């Protein structure tokens, strides 16, 4: 990589850093973003190595190439029981940015991705249904941007194959019973009016 020879194994150059060098070699791209998801789910035994990586951009003696930045993401503990709370030493090595769901921003992405029009028109009317997480005595009830996107994909596929899109299907992706029921009713009306006006 970069004119130098390295052996890549779990005991030498990190697979993560090796992947960056491979991208550079394969594409000629010399700068970019190295994205690490679920950073706060790293096991306690890997925490020291992760701290070193975040602060110095190195694993052992191998450094992330110049021109590459590290971006990480993690979910809050209320969304994932595997999360380990960062201590002050960890927080001191990162720039924290809390991201909140915003339908108007997501809608631009969703439109570009070809999101099912029933979902977009429904959420235009019911913005509160876009993102919701509730803990009740009956368990967790939630709906997320990922759930809507996954639902859109299965709806498009189901319609193409003439398979039913019903409450049973919708509830697998929209895991809030009230919102799932409301959307199922809306979808039935959406289909009816779509058929009437074609």
Task: Give each language-model segment a name.
Residues 166, 170-192:
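Non-catalytic, alpha-helical, charged scaffold/linker segments
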Residues 16-20, 158, 183, 187:
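Generic hydrophobic, helix-prone segments enriched in Leu/Val/Ile
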Residues 48, 145-149, 177, 181:
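Non-catalytic, well-ordered alpha-helical scaffold segments
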């Amino acid at each position: 990589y970069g004119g130098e020879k390295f052996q890549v194994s779990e005991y030498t150059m990190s697979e993560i850093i090796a992947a960056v060098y491979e991208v550079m070699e394969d594409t000629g791209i010399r700068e970019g973003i190295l994205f690490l998801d679920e950073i706060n789910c790293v096991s306690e035994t890997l925490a020291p190595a992760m701290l070193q990586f975040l602060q110095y951009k190195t694993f052992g003696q191998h450094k992330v190439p110049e021109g590459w930045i590290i971006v990480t993401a993690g979910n809050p503990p209320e969304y994932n029981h595997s999360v380990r709370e960062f201590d002050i030493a960890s927080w001191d090595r990162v720039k924290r940015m809390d991201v909140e769901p915003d339908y108007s921003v997501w809608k631009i992405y969703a439109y570009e991705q070809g999101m099912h029009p029933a979902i977009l028109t429904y959420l235009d009317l019911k913005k509160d249904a876009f993102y919701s997480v509730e803990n009740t005595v009956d368990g967790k009830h939630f709906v997320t941007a990922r759930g809507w996107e996954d639902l859109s994909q299965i709806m498009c596929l189901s319609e193409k194959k003439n398979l039913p899109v019903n409450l049973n299907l919708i509830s697998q992706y929209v895991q809030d019973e009230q919102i799932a029921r409301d959307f199922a009713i809306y979808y039935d009306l959406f289909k009816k009016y779509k058929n009437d006006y074609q």
